[in-house]
């Protein structure tokens, strides 16, 4: 299952398919970025070395924002809109993405 490929609209017989694939690819990229940032912030907060209370508050705020964004993307993968855009199984895609982070 390749999720890193998009086609040029000029070469595509069905331009809507290229757009649909680009939407899915961007959602996958955004999910990966959120996962990486969440892990980095959680590690930073867990170590707590050299972090002032103000920095800890700011990091927790950032963590919340990334968790919210990741949740929205997760919801998208289970949405009817996702199934209109793609034949992929959203649950399997998420399992695969979550395995990448481990």
Role assignments for model-derived ranges:
Residues 73-102:
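Short, compact, well-ordered microdomains
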Residues 26-31, 35, 45, 49-52, ...:
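Short, flexible helical or helix-coil boundary motifs
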Residues 56-81:
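Acidic, low-complexity, intrinsically disordered interaction modules
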Residues 39-65:
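Intrinsically disordered, low-complexity domain-flanking/linker segments in eukaryotic proteins
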Residues 2-39:
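N-terminal acidic leader/helix
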């Amino acid at each position: 299952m390749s999720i890193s490929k998009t086609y040029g609209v000029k070469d595509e017989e069905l331009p809507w398919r290229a757009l649909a694939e680009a939407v899915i690819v961007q959602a996958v990229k955004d999910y990966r970025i959120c996962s990486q940032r969440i892990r980095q912030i959680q590690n930073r907060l867990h170590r707590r070395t050299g972090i002032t209370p103000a920095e800890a508050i700011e990091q927790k705020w950032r963590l919340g924002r990334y968790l919210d964004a990741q949740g929205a993307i997760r919801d998208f993968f289970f949405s009817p809109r996702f199934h209109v855009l793609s034949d992929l199984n959203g649950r399997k895609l998420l399992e695969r993405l979550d395995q990448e982070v481990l």
